[in-house]
């Protein structure tokens, strides 16, 4: 049986690992559009605050999971799903085209909600969303590169991650405004 998983975050990697362990003869292919798999999102703010190491939030490399028999394809984006014919259109550095599957798991995770704010652009250098490993690395790099001149941070969203990010910014010496 050919199992295809879309999304290499915690859920996608956990499913792939457990499924392959229980069904070693089945083929498991996992597509992740970024460079990272097995990202633990919940402790992200503590990583940004330098309380955790990168290895505490990245629980393996693609190579680690390939050794377990999971065919991990990073930098691959699924652009179309044909449920009727059980095919996917994939765009990536190794696979470009249509592949078939027997069973499909969609584990793409959450996407940050950005309210309609006049003047907002995803290209603003000091405005970030946080829903993936790459976002966390950008925030951490920005803080480290600009620490002396940063004074204030605004966090939009008072869920667990938002509150923990507010705490992380305070630990980085910033005044924080939390908006819910």
Cite the ranges covered by each PLM segment.
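Beta1-alpha1 glycine-rich phosphate/pyrophosphate-binding loop at the start
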Residues: 1-71, 168-180
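FAD-binding core/adjacent interface of flavoenzyme oxidoreductases
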Residues: 1-4, 61-154, 177
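Glycine-rich Rossmann-fold phosphate-binding loop(s) that bind the pyrophosphate
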Residues: 7-10, 131-132, 157-159
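Glycine-rich nucleophile elbow surrounding the catalytic serine of serine-hydrolase chemistry
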Residues: 13-14, 160-164
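Short, mixed-charge, low-aromatic patches
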Residues: 17-23, 37-38, 91-98, 153-159
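Flexible loop residues that form catalytic
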Residues: 33, 109-110, 158
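Conserved acidic functional residues
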Residues: 82, 164, 180
